[in-house]
Amino acid sequence: PNDRPRPPTKGSPSDSPLFNRAVQGVYELGSTFKIFAAAQALEIGLANPSTLIDADAPMRWGKYTIKEFEGHNYGPLISLTDVIVKSSNVGTAHVALQIGEKRQQEFLKALGFFEPTKVELFEAPYAKPLTPKNWSDIHTITISYGHGLSASPLHLAAAYASLTNGGTKVTPTLVKQAYRIPGPRIVSEETSAAARA
């Protein structure tokens, strides 16, 4: 079953019915990433759910302008909870800048966004997320709201599970197990509970 022939037609491999989009496809995952910046801010003590965050749009960063979807302006200040509820790009960007480039990378790495998933599928080792070569402040900003880093839907599901299952790393598996051995701690149980709220 793993000696699959190449599709008989020309074109992109991702057009093949044999291409596993959930595992092999890497995409910019957009606003689904915002929860990671908020959770990290909670975890490292930068904010609590009611901390007021600058959400005045648009935000200028050097030659770049960060806008909200459909031109909304949620500012000048909204709570960290509302940054997630309203899906504020600007609010998330401000949170990410407080976290900083290095801590953001470490957190996303702990969640599994720098390596292929370890699921027991032939194609899994070939689906490594795409990350910036030179991670700058603008990458820190855009990655916080899901642009500039591409990962598979399975990466996202595993990261969400790790964040919301009590805060320990979840490794996807197809093997039925009598019980799950918890992975390394990613966030505290308190942060995990806040992310679920």
For every predicted segment, state its role:
Residues 1-31, 36-197:
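Beta-lactam-recognizing serine transpeptidase/beta-lactamase-like catalytic domain environment
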